[in-house]
């Protein structure tokens, strides 16, 4: 029979398939599957995945970032921390208003920043001499742009400005160009800068307290010790030399350790401005300088006399209130991002805790018997602090 004469095969039954059930709606997962780049929260991570997947970037990128960061770091440091072109050592920018000129009005205002050791000098003298009511205070904080700024929690109590630069710029005499630094002693009546050099502000406050009689007998700037004070103040500032040679820093600390092992304060039994200048450096050493500035040969706590000396001053009335360790750490590790680009804040060392700084210092024995028999002899607040700490 011919092929075409055979009956056709019966038609197969039609198989109807049901559509697959819809996938559960996961907007994030769907966006990630369709567009992993768009789903990424981090633009740098997204770009990295687009170019290289999940693998590490190639060595060329590492080299480019390394050299680019080094160049950017150098530029930032030249602006934020000027240095000697020949040696690379830190060179502090001279103050625009280095001395008190004339006689300021009675309406004075002090601007400080808690992380700054130079501003801390003025703040410490204000506390030691009992000038809190006489001298109102505004505390600036490091802003994201590196400028001293004010916040709702730490406002400009005088004018309500947002930046310290705006206070400088509001001066009546020709405005201001340059760095808006702290400390700043401001004449609120005449709207002009009195001084922004820390040691000169400290000396002025000593004279102000003596005239007001608010110092309680404490004289941080006695005429008979001024030559020694100036010598020690200059020596205390040599901590900046670690940028050039760390050996100079630790040689200076060794010399101070030796001197203070036989003398309660730098100039004998009397607390002076020289001690103020040194204290604001020492109280930051283990907290900041040891790790951030790579001063790692020894910690301050390893110097028995220096650490006891620091505790001695810390325990004087009003001093602890000027030492905000959290603000100091944040000001260095958070604001100085060229030195700590990750912005990670380390734990406060045990030696810098209030509990450690309030431990007995035992330095009363270094005071001469003549000073003890005199009942304080011109240093009443100092002996009051000693008795309070025991």
Model-derived features: where do they sit?
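Short amphipathic alpha-helical segments
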Residues: 251, 280, 301-312
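Acidic, serine/threonine/proline-rich low-complexity intrinsically disordered regions
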Residues: 240-243, 290-304
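GST superfamily/GST-like fold recognition
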Residues: 266-292, 299, 313
């Amino acid at each position: 029979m011919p092929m075409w004469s055979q009956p056709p095969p019966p038609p197969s039954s039609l198989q109807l398939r049901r559509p697959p059930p819809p996938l559960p709606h996961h907007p994030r997962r769907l966006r990630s599957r369709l567009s992993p780049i768009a789903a990424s929260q981090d633009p740098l991570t997204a770009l990295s995945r687009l170019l290289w997947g999940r693998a590490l970037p190639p060595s060329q990128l590492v080299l480019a970032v390394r050299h680019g960061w080094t160049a950017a770091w150098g530029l930032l440091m030249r602006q934020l921390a000027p240095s000697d072109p020949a040696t690379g050592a830190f060179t502090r920018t001279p103050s625009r208003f280095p001395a008190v000129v004339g006689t300021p009005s009675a309406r004075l205002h002090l601007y400080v920043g808690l992380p700054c050791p130079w501003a801390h000098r003025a703040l410490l003298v204000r506390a030691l001499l009992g000038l809190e009511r006489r001298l109102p205070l505004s505390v600036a904080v490091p802003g994201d742009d590196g400028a001293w700024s004010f916040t709702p929690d730490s406002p400009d109590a005088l004018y309500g400005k947002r930046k310290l630069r705006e206070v400088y710029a509001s001066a009546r005499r020709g405005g201001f160009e340059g760095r808006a630094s702290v400390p700043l002693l401001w004449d609120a009546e005449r709207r002009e800068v009195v001084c922004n050099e820390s040691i000169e502000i400290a000396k002025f406050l000593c004279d102000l307290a003596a005239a007001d009689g608010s110092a309680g007998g404490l004289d941080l700037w006695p005429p008979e010790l001024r030559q020694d004070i100036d010598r020690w103040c200059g020596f205390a500032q040599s901590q900046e030399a670690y940028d050039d040679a760390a050996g100079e820093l630790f040689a200076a600390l060794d010399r101070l350790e030796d001197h203070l092992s036989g003398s309660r304060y730098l100039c004998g039994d009397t607390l002076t401005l020289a001690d103020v200048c040194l204290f604001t450096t020492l109280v930051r050493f283990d907290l900041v300088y040891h790790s951030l500035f790579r001063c790692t040969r020894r910690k301050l706590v390893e110097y028995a006399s220096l650490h006891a000396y620091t505790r001695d001053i810390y325990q004087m009335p009003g001093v602890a209130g000027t030492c905000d360790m959290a603000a100091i750490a944040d000001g260095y590790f958070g604001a100085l991002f060229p030195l700590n680009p990750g912005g990670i804040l380390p734990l406060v060392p045990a030696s810098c805790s209030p509990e450690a700084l309030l431990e007995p210092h035992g330095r009363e024995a270094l005071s001469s018997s003549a000073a003890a028999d005199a009942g304080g002899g011109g240093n009443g607040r100092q002996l009051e602090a000693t008795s309070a700490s025991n």
